[in-house]
Amino acid sequence: MMLRKFHGLIFLLVCAIHAHSDLAFSAEYRIGGVNPEALLCRPEGKGPFPAVVHNHGVGVDTVGYQKAVKRGYDLPGICKELAAGGFLTFVPIRQGGPGLRNLPPHKAQVLEAIDYMKRLADVDQSRIALTGNSRGGLLTLMVGVERSDLKALVIMAPAEIGRNFSNALSQISSLNAPVLLLVEKGDEPEFQNNFDALDRVLRENKKEFKSIRYDQGGGHSLFHTAGYYLQDIKVFLHDKLGGK
């Protein structure tokens, strides 16, 4: 009888650990390599540097880092381009796959990434920006309306997952950071509508922001590349974060 109870206790502990692991994310990262947990790109010179945490879209969650890069998802190029602009750039590769149920742990991973950056000696803790596209854009907004320590947000073609985008819009009054909002004209109606809704709510709440709807092609995939839009991001970040 005691042995049966002991086995039952072990089973419950294993289940509890497994359930908790869905939300847990290590603050230590395997940087770079074939199967990285994150990318980290440093500018030339000595810090402390202004910093960027970049949140990728759902394509990486769906097929994994290696396949996404082979399909044109140029996270290394984005990371290097932002670093060339003078920003120490960190790109966490989210764990857990796509879907609504993984959004809370993905949000927790963004928070962990910000805290990780604040511990780096060559990061200026007072000058950290959060950027992201699609699912990463939604996560950027969700975190941005809750934290007061972010210097700027860049939100590209944000997605609606469940009602999380709508819920974040209802919290815009608490937003402190200036926002750069981007979308490409050829993107799908969902992302155009989300762009318009966020633009409207930012305007109604008299928040500091700039919105750009590009008309140069690329659609939703534009923000998977290290493309022309990064120049606007670098100008915005230099204005809000300053140089080294």
Give residue ranges: language-model regions.
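Alpha/beta-hydrolase
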Residues: 55, 156, 214-215
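Alpha/beta-hydrolase active-site loop
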Residues: 74, 100-121
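The feature captures the conserved acid-bearing segment of alpha/beta-hydrolase catalytic domains
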Residues: 152, 157-210
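C-terminal catalytic histidine-bearing segment of alpha/beta-hydrolase fold enzymes
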Residues: 206-244
